[in-house]
């Protein structure tokens, strides 16, 4: 145990004037001799920010000393992982909690208007030329996947990127993303005269929940064909929980030597990229673009070539990918906000804030559909393309800190106490909030059938979605892939049968022919059009799997299941009438524990009765 002399010296080291050490957490004062100089500094930081309650229960030195040191290890992590440190976090929390209690509207003083952007029509000349421009730019790009979440909300215990994107091939989301990036890399390099050794960098942001499982998925599958040196894993830390309106940090209910923590949100990706040093490395090797995307949208790479083409041709510093949005649909709208003081920004405004904001600023109908049948404020799908130079300049100023929000659940209308601890949160798409008015911020809209089919709702929640609204479930996500591929082949001239309507897990969906292909086969529409000829047809009950880059379809009449595998550059033309019993669709109840989770959450599986498999 420390002597009084040591205790006095330690109190002096804390820099607490006026002999106030005895008033400020005496249990901490008694334990100061245990602490290293950097831990004493952290203790001082906590006391100066009103956190003396964290030490009230500390026993005499000699009791739980290892736990006390572990406490400061955690504080050190929390301090180093937040831009500006823990003091900034607590100060930001106090301000945001005070605003929340006062009912302050973050959009006070702002008027909304429709921002400028590009609306694309799949398959027209403009779309085709933008896709080609995007492929050309791809070798100057880096991709960033935010994948910090588990699939619990879906009714799946694993990491979301390990879920099958579709069950015809069983390929998971992460495999599809990597194969798509590699296809872009190959196609982009082919456009360069001479040798091109470009390897497109791929960053995955993980969390404590997903990190080990993500690494295992990559390593056990040889990185799905990507070179391990191309892949960078950045793990986000959690942030401290807040117990009350004074931003007193909450202790873990199960461990009084641990601060309770929760995820901060995917906005952390910007601070992680800033501190990683990767951006400087990328810029020095000629990278121009950083593309951000989320973990379970199976259609997103359909949108990337044309959207990257828009960024390059329009010179956008920030390009948000978007889809047409019905008024009041539960998806954020991309909006230009102009403040009374002249400030402007183009950002995502959540759907439940957009309607009242419009009504409060002279739009009596609020968020209403215009003559197109859609809201003029396009739906944000959380895919961003940032120009690397301006992005790095902004991060030099902010160190990656993103505008935060807090969402406490109060016990009653006085807003004095919380039902449970809260924390600050931030979102990747709020990056533009701090940009100067001179920044070129735009958007690219394309049809939802082509670009957006997120998997985020479990079967019970999806079944409650009002009819006509998107389910955003594993069921709808898989069926959307078949729909998109069928419509793309139709646009290329093939005769693809109409879908039938069926219900799985209480969700009514269109069931199109089960058509899938590897990204190398049909990266952009021009590729598909060159390989599919108009005298081919596929029946509704059919499945067609194309595993090969140089497979052409000419004069094919398919009624059943056909799988075509061609190695590397092998060329093969699929033709003739092919009929077999095929694969039937079998309904599965989401409560049927005899089936795997990834099947149960879809509500169907394939009964592989008969197929023709061709190998070249």
From Swiss-Prot:
Q: What is its EC number?
A: 2.7.7.64
For this UniProt record, give its keywords in alphabetical order, as a comma-separated list.
Answer: Nucleotidyltransferase, Transferase
Xref: SUPFAM superfamilies = Nucleotide-diphospho-sugar transferases (SSF53448)
Q: Does the keyword Cytoplasm apply?
A: no
Superkingdom per UniProt: Eukaryota
Give the catalytic activity. Answer: a monosaccharide 1-phosphate + UTP + H(+) = a UDP-monosaccharide + diphosphate
**Could you say which enzyme class this protein belongs to?**
transferase
Which Gene Ontology molecular-function terms are recorded? UDP-N-acetylglucosamine diphosphorylase activity; UTP-monosaccharide-1-phosphate uridylyltransferase activity
GO BP: any one term:
UDP-N-acetylglucosamine biosynthetic process
Q: Which InterPro entries match?
A: Nucleotide-diphossugar_trans (IPR029044), UDP-sugar_pyrophosphorylase (IPR039741), UDPGP_fam (IPR002618)
Cofactor(s) the protein requires to work:
Mg(2+); Mn(2+)
**Per the similarity annotation, which family is this?**
Belongs to the USP family.
What does this protein do, in the record's words?
May function as the terminal enzyme of the myo-inositol oxidation (MIO) pathway. May also play a role in the salvage pathway for synthesis of nucleotide sugars.
Q: What is this protein called?
A: UDP-sugar pyrophosphorylase
């Amino acid at each position: 145990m420390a002597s009084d002399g040591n205790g006095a010296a330690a109190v002096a080291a804390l820099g607490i004037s006026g002999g106030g050490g005895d008033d400020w957490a005496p249990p901490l004062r008694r334990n100061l001799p245990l602490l290293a100089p950097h831990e004493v500094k952290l203790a001082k930081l906590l006391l100066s920010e009103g956190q003396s309650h964290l030490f009230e229960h500390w026993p005499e030195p000699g009791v739980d000393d290892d736990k006390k040191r572990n406490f400061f290890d955690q504080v050190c992590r929390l301090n180093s992982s937040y831009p500006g440190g823990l003091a900034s976090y607590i100060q930001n929390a106090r301000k945001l909690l005070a605003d929340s209690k006062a009912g302050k509207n973050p959009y006070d003083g702002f008027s909304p208007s429709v921002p400028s952007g590009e609306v694309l029509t799949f398959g027209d000349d403009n779309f085709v030329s933008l896709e080609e421009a995007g492929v050309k730019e791809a070798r100057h790009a880096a991709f960033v996947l935010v994948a910090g979440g588990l699939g619990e909300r879906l009714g799946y215990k694993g990491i979301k990127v390990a879920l099958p994107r579709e069950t015809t091939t069983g390929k998971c989301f992460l495999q599809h993303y990597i194969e798509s990036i590699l296809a872009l890399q190959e196609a982009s390099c082919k456009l360069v005269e001479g040798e091109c050794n470009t390897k497109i960098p791929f960053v995955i942001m993980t969390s404590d929940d997903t990190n080990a499982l993500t690494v295992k998925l990559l390593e056990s599958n040889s990185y799905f064909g990507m070179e391990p040196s191309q892949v960078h894993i950045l793990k986000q830390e959690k942030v401290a929980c807040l117990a009350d309106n004074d931003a007193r940090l909450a202790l873990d209910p199960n461990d009084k030597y641990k601060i309770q923590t929760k995820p901060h949100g995917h906005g952390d990706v910007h601070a992680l990229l800033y501190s990683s040093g990767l951006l400087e490395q990328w810029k020095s090797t000629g990278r121009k673009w950083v593309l951000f995307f989320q973990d379970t949208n199976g259609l997103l790479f359909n949108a990337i070539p044309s959207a990257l083409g828009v960024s390059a041709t329009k010179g956008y510093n920030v390009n948000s990918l978007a889809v047409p949005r019905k008024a009041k649909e539960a998806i954020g709208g991309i909006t230009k906000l102009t403040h009374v003081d002249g400030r402007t920004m183009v950002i995502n405004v959540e759907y439940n804030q957009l309607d009242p904001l419009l009504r409060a600023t002279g739009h009596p109908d609020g968020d209403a559909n215009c003559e197109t049948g859609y809201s003029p404020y396009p739906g944000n799908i959380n895919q961003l393309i940032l120009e690397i130079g301006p992005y790095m300049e902004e991060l030099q100023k902010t160190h990656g800190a993103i505008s935060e929000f807090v969402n406490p659940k109060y016990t009653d209308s006085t807003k004095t106490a919380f039902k449970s601890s809260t924390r600050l949160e931030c979102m990747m798409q709020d990056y533009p909030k701090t940009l100067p008015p001179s920044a070129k911020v735009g958007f690219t809209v394309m049809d939802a059938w082509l670009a957006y089919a997120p998997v985020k709702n479990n079967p019970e929640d999806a079944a409650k979605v009002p009819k006509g609204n998107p389910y955003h479930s594993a069921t709808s996500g898989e069926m959307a892939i078949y729909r998109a591929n069928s419509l793309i082949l139709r646009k290329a001239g093939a005769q693809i049968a109409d879908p039938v309507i069926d219900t799985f897990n209480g969700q009514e969906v269109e069931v199109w022919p089960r058509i899938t292909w590897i990204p190398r086969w049909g990266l952009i529409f021009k590729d598909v059009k060159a390989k599919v000829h108009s005298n081919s047809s596929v029946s509704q009950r059919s499945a067609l799997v194309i595993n090969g880059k140089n497979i052409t379809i000419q004069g094919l009449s398919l009624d059943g299941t056909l799988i075509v595998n061609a190695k590397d550059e092998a060329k093969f033309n699929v033709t003739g009438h092919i009929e077999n019993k095929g694969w039937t669709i079998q309904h599965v109840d989401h409560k049927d524990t005899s089936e795997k989770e990834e099947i149960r959450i879809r509500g169907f599986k394939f009964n592989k009765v008969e197929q023709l498999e061709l190998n070249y």
